[in-house]
């Protein structure tokens, strides 16, 4: 395969797990057999499986808009997001400068943290300990994620009252 200038210049900077993903991932179960046959660390297996699930699952493809990239960043971390974007760059015939810019943008970012904890719900809002705290915390987290990682006390109270 012919590489564009970006991929040529950055090919030697790839780590082992990502390089393996470029070699073994496709629509077959080759990666599963590879994991069975060769001793690959669980961390590297997880990274390769993330890329495979993202690109080769039956789900409709996810667009690389800002909100979706932030969600990937939150759920899979910086390394997972960079792997997903790099895989797209290295397997495409043309270089998408937007993807390179996104990698550079997220390199210096920290994963967002939800400021509300279960202890806060129990202490400040009088919710009894138990399963309900987890359910409400999950609802708050979903609203927080869909609202670009911002949530007001008003929204929290509204969720807790429902």
Where are these predicted regions, by residue range?
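Charged substrate- and nucleic-acid-binding regions of tRNA-handling and nucleotidyl-transfer enzymes
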Residues: 89-162
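Conserved, hydrophobic alpha-helical core segments of structured domains
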Residues: 1-92
């Amino acid at each position: 395969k012919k590489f564009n200038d970006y991929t040529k210049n950055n090919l030697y900077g790839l780590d082992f797990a990502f390089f393996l993903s470029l070699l073994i991932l496709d629509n077959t179960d080759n990666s599963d057999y590879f994991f069975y046959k060769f001793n690959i660390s669980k961390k590297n297996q997880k990274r390769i499986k993330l890329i495979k699930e993202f690109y080769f699952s039956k789900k409709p493809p996810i667009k690389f808009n800002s909100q979706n990239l932030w969600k990937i960043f939150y759920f899979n971390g910086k390394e997972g997001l960079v792997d997903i974007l790099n895989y797209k760059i290295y397997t495409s015939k043309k270089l998408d400068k937007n993807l390179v810019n996104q990698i550079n943008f997220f390199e210096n970012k920290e994963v967002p943290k939800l400021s509300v904890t279960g202890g806060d719900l129990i202490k400040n809002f009088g919710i009894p300990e138990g399963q309900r705290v987890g359910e409400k915390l999950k609802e708050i987290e979903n609203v927080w994620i869909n609202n670009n990682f911002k949530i007001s006390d008003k929204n929290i109270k509204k969720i807790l009252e429902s």
